[in-house]
Each structure stands twice: as structure tokens, then as C-alpha cells.
């Protein structure tokens, strides 16, 4: 059994308030009603104030310790699963935590092994290892039912987590869900380039989101990821699923979310496309839609329970 230990780390972060965090949508609130009630303006940010946060570590025998931050609260809890080499302090993760705080719900955000504050070597990372990281967070830190929010590659992993822990994962929210995308993009390369990557052991994938202009992805990561592809067959996930995707996404085509929606067994699936949003979905309107979709899922699950 993994053990969580707390490292008191003083940090000053801005306190935020969502202008419409507690809007009541009524007992029969659906997605169309939710979108209709989203205000046209962005959330109103209040002046920064001091707030002490704490960084914790999940100790795992024979596995790297995972850095995480956990907000205690009521169920269902929210777990944010980041994208490739992304940290737990990203825009979406922080916005979700603040939104959960305003509603009194539990929230967990974490760094994969080899990433951010977690132990491990990023060059030794694999999708399978990160899958184990997600399951460790669910098994050892999360209390009760959970809504998983997966960003990009995190959306791929949230599907795997839902398959492995159906009794605990009660809803999914994917943002630019990158199911199978890394493998698909690599397989689309010219044969000569694929051979070159195999010889070098690294694929320098161009990306405007990297400071270096490329993501240096280990060839071993790509080959191992082939064992975790999902879109070739029905995906045994039956919980409510919401998939958000920007139509200007030049990293993960928005059609990927459509494929996921088609492959999952769940009949409660909504795909929401934003015409002018890119891969990161970090604009204020994107974040607003994200947190309101979480709120809608919480309301839906509460209605089912009651």
C-alpha cells in the first residue's frame, strides 16, 4: 500500500473567485440549458491574496514517489490528469481546483513520475507507467466516487482508468482527448523518417507549445504506447462522458473526440466543439466552459444518486 506523506511547502498563490460559480440550474439542468446560462463575459478575477498551500508525496514501494496537491471536500471528487509532460500547476488544473473549492468538492492534481516535482526520470517514462500513476492516485488518495478530467494525453489515460476502476470512476471529462494520437501521428510519418527515429531513439516532434519548438519523445515511449491503443475496438466505459475540443487544434484533430464518442459503450456522451479554440483550451471562455461542464456532471450524478 502506498503511503502519502506531507511536505509543508509555503507558496503564495492568487485567490480567485468565479463570478458565476454557484448559479443554480434547476433539477432538470441539461447541457443545452447549461450552455445557455453561461454568461458571455469571462469569470471575474479578484485581486490576489495570500494563501498557504502544501505539497504532498505519495510514497510507493518500488515505484517513484508522486507529488500531488489534494483539496478535501465532498463527493464526487475531481481528479485532473495532465497532458504529456505537463505539470499540476497548469491553468486548467488551478482553475478546476478553485472551482471545486467554491463548490466544496474534493480535488486532486498531481505530477506524473519523472515530471515536475515527482520522483523519476522523464526519459524512462512510458504511457504504461503513467497509467499506474493515475491508478495509484485513484486507489490511494481518492475517497469515494470520482470525476476524471483528462487533458490531451491525460484524456487517453482517463479512459484507461475508467476501464480499470469502473466502481470508482463515475464520469469523464476530456479536453482535447488524445486517445492513440501519439502512435497514430508516428505511424503516419514517412518510412525513412521512422527508421531515423528508431536509430536515434528520439522523435523530435515539432510543436509551437514547446519552448524549444519540438517535443523530444523517446522512441521507447512510442513503442510502449502501442500496447495501450483503444480506438481499434469498442471501449468498455459506461459512465457519463463529456468531450471538449477546439476545432483549431493542430496537435490532436477534433475528429479524435468523435472517434472516442463512437467507440465508448456509454450512451451518455456529449462532444462539444469550440470553433476558434486551439489545443490548449486555455482561453477564459474555454476555462469557463470546462468548469461549468464539471458542475453539470456533478449535478447529474447527484440527481442519479437521489
Curated annotation (Swiss-Prot):
Gene3D superfamilies named in the record: alpha/beta hydrolase (3.40.50.1820)
Entry superkingdom: Eukaryota
Major localisation: mitochondrion
Pfam families listed in its UniProt record: Abhydrolase_1 (PF00561)
Entry's Gene Ontology cellular component terms: mitochondrion
Subcellular localization, as worded in the UniProt entry: Mitochondrion
Reactions listed under catalytic activity: S-hexadecanoyl-L-cysteinyl-[protein] + H2O = L-cysteinyl-[protein] + hexadecanoate + H(+); mycophenolic acid O-acyl-beta-D-glucuronide + H2O = mycophenolate + D-glucuronate + H(+)
One GO BP annotation of this record: protein depalmitoylation
Mechanisms controlling activity: Inhibited by palmostatin-B.
Enzyme Commission designation: 3.1.2.22, 3.1.1.93
Active site, per annotation: 152 (charge relay system), 249 (charge relay system), 279 (charge relay system)
Molecular-function annotations in GO: hydrolase activity, hydrolyzing O-glycosyl compounds; mycophenolic acid acyl-glucuronide esterase activity; palmitoyl-(protein) hydrolase activity
Keywords: Hydrolase, Mitochondrion, Transit peptide
Domain AB hydrolase-1: 78-177
Residue interval of the organelle targeting sequence: 1-52
Function field: Acts as an acyl-protein thioesterase that hydrolyzes fatty acids from acylated residues in proteins. Regulates the mitochondrial S-depalmitoylation of the nucleophilic active site residue of peroxiredoxin-5/PRDX5, a key antioxidant protein, therefore modulating mitochondrial antioxidant ability. Also catalyzes the deglucuronidation of mycophenolic acid acyl-glucuronide, an active metabolite of the immunosuppressant drug mycophenolate.
Family the UniProt entry places it in: Belongs to the AB hydrolase superfamily.
Protein name: Palmitoyl-protein thioesterase ABHD10, mitochondrial
Native species: Pongo abelii (Sumatran orangutan)
Amino acid at each position: 500500500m502506498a503511503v502519502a506523506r506531507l511536505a509543508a511547502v509555503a507558496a503564495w498563490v492568487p485567490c480567485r473567485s468565479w463570478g458565476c460559480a454557484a448559479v443554480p440550474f434547476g433539477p432538470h439542468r441539461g447541457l443545452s440549458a447549461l450552455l445557455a446560462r453561461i454568461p458571455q463575459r469571462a469569470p471575474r478575477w479578484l485581486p490576489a491574496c495570500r494563501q498557504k498551500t502544501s505539497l504532498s508525496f505519495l510514497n510507493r514501494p518500488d515505484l517513484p514517489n508522486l507529488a500531488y496537491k489534494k483539496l478535501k471536500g465532498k463527493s464526487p471528487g475531481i481528479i485532473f490528469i495532465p497532458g504529456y509532460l505537463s505539470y499540476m500547476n497548469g491553468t486548467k488544473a488551478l482553475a478546476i481546483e478553485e472551482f471545486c473549492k467554491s463548490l466544496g468538492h474534493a480535488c486532486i492534481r498531481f505530477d506524473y513520475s519523472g515530471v515536475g516535482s515527482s520522483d523519476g526520470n522523464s526519459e524512462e517514462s512510458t504511457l504504461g507507467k503513467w497509467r499506474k500513476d493515475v491508478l495509484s492516485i485513484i486507489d490511494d488518495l481518492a475517497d469515494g466516487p470520482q470525476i476524471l478530467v483528462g487533458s490531451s494525453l491525460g484524456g487517453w489515460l482517463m479512459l484507461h482508468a475508467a476501464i480499470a476502476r469502473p466502481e470508482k470512476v463515475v464520469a469523464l471529462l476530456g479536453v482535447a482527448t488524445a486517445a492513440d494520437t501519439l502512435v497514430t501521428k508516428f505511424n503516419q510519418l514517412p518510412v525513412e523518417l521512422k527508421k531515423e527515429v528508431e536509430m536515434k531513439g528520439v522523435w523530435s516532434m515539432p510543436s509551437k507549445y514547446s519552448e524549444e519548438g519540438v517535443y523530444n519523445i523517446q522512441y521507447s515511449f512510442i513503442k510502449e504506447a502501442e500496447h495501450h491503443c483503444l480506438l481499434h475496438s469498442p471501449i468498455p466505459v459506461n459512465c457519463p462522458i463529456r468531450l471538449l475540443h477546439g476545432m483549431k487544434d493542430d496537435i490532436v484533430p477534433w475528429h479524435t473526440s468523435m472517434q472516442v464518442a463512437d467507440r465508448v459503450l456509454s450512451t451518455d456522451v456529449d462532444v462539444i466543439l469550440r470553433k476558434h479554440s486551439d489545443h490548449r483550451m486555455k482561453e477564459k471562455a474555454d476555462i469557463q466552459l470546462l468548469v461549468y461542464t464539471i458542475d453539470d456532471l456533478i449535478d447529474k450524478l447527484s440527481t442519479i444518486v437521489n
